[in-house]
Every structure is written in structure tokens, then in C-alpha cells.
């Protein structure tokens, strides 16, 4: 029932090559989408520019790229890759909000295997160079991978169900079908007492947000729709519904790299936050992060520059922002991940939360290094110092008493708290 604008390339006609006339047709449709405030969906299946038209074909690409840029943040743009996309033609999908690739059928690359072989001597096949799996897990270009064209269209429809038609509207709200105060006692034991043990944050996300009946009464279906699932798995982002309303969900993933922030995770989070803010989607963030990934690879790769993108994204976001600290919230990572200090509206902490400049063990080793070297039983004394540090500086109750978090809540009551907070913030200006 949603209005959308669609442009499709037909590979059976001259390989779907991009001509001056095709450019005019696609640009006209995109202009209409912008003017009417409806999402734009591009079905890409083309060998690239129509060489025999010379520079006119390139001019057509330029006109399309310009319109993709003008539409950014105004209407949602989705690219569905159903075949090849090579050379300059990749920049139009690259400028859109979401890319859905079809496994085994679609390939994206700027320079093909033959050119790479000639210039660099490197042998690489199409799938390794620019296949769906490569772009979904390595480059991060693809947000979704479909098994075939039918699934690609199904993903497109599901994605559109979470998105507003334009930046002046709110996402479609569904009649609530789940109990807004539904408690889930299983969440109270989700986080292991040992901070070195991992858990899957998806288990919390799928239980907290709206569920609807599945094929089995004992197995409800979660409304959580993950985006970029294969890229930077140490962070989880996606859409969900909370009492019928669409929210953007961001979370560290302790089950992968302890949920640490690295370059790829920073880019993944920042881009998603900015998209949600642009299309009036409230943000809910779950924090369990020991910090930023150390090492020369990350430092030389620009972790400072990429990490700053998260600060910028959350700081400029004007939509309702709610944060839940589930366990570790250390140092700069705590600050950038929707903390109170960058104007998050509501911050909750589970009793397992540990909010501090750094982990208790590391802090004790620095603060009491000389004293530990002098005692006869350093392990016992260190354990005592660690316990004292956690209670005095890392306890969520200490953070709540100081106003750094708004409340310490039981994990089982998280859903009720989030529903109430979102209802309170609905008319946030």
C-alpha cells in the first residue's frame, strides 16, 4: 500500500547499458520521487555506460549522481542489485541508503579482473572481487544479501515497512499487538557474572522489542530487522518496533571481539544513526563495550577519525535517544555511545553495568602498581582493590546517584521502561 518510485534496467536490451535516454528517464523518475516525497527504488542490472554514445553517457551518469545526492536525507533510496554493476555506475548505488545484493548474480566493482590483472598482476575472480558475500562482510558496501531475486524484492518490501516516505513524515506505526509491560525474567540472567564471558546481545533485542505470533504459539517472531548483519559483527544495528512504533536499534555485540569499537564498527554505527535521525526514527542503544580497539592497524587506519563519526552522529541527532548500559561502559567508548553527556534523553543501566574510565583490573594495576610490587600476596591484595574500585567508581548505583544515568533497572523490566520513555519523548522538539 506504499507509494514508491521505481527505475529498472533491462539487461536484455543492449546489456542494460546506460544511455543518454535512459539517464533522462531515470532522472525524471527520481525528480518526481523527490517532489512527491516517496521512496526511490533502483533495480540495477547493467554492463555500464553505453560506450558508443561517448561523453553523453557519462553526462547521464553525472546527472543521476547529482540527483542521488540531492535526494539523500530527503527520501529513502534503495538499490537492488540483480546483475553486474561496474565502473562509474557503482556510484549511484553507493550514494543510496541501502544496497541489496543477490548472491551469485550481482557483482559490483570499479575495475574488473582483467584490468586488475593487466595493471597490478593480481589474479582475482568476479565473486572474490565484488560478489555479494565480499561486499556484505568485507567492504560493507552491501547491507543485505538475498538468495535470489524474489528474496531481494521481499527484503525491499520489508525494509520499506520500517521507513518513513520522506524526512517530513514519521515511519508507519502499526497497531500494538504485544503487551507494553511484558516482563521477561530470562533477561535477568542473560549477562554472565564474569565480565570475561560473552553473550549474544541479539537475545536481549529480540525479547525486548515487539513480538508477534509465529507458526508455533511458543515461538513468537521478533520485529527486529537487522541491517549490515555480516559487516563489523562486533556491532549490531537494525530496525524494530516498540509498542507499534519504529525505532533504530544500536548495540555492541559481546559475542564478537567483546563488542569493542573498531574502524568498521564506528562507520557502521555512525551511518545508521545519521540515517535514523534524518528520517525521524528514535534511537535505542545497548552498551557493553570495553573501549576502542588498540593497535597500530587501527591507529594508522584512522580510528580517531572514524570513532569521531559516532560522536558527531549522536550529538547532532535530534530524535528521541534512549540508552541502556548492560555491562561494560568504559572510557571514550562510553561517551560516544549515546551517553548522557552528548544529550541522550534517557539513560538506564542494568545492575550488571560497570561505568568507569577503564576496567577495574587495568585501573588497579596503574593506580597501585608500586604497592602491589611491595606486598607478599599481590593477587589477594589486587582482588581486594579491584572489588573496592568497582564499588566506588564502576557501580551503576554510584553513576545513578551522580546523575550520570537516570535509573538502574532490572533487565526483565527493560521493555516497560523503554515503552514509557518513548511515549514521553514522542513529541520531543
Which residue stretches match the model-derived regions?
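Ligand-binding clefts of soluble mixed alpha/beta catalytic domains
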Residues: 1-429
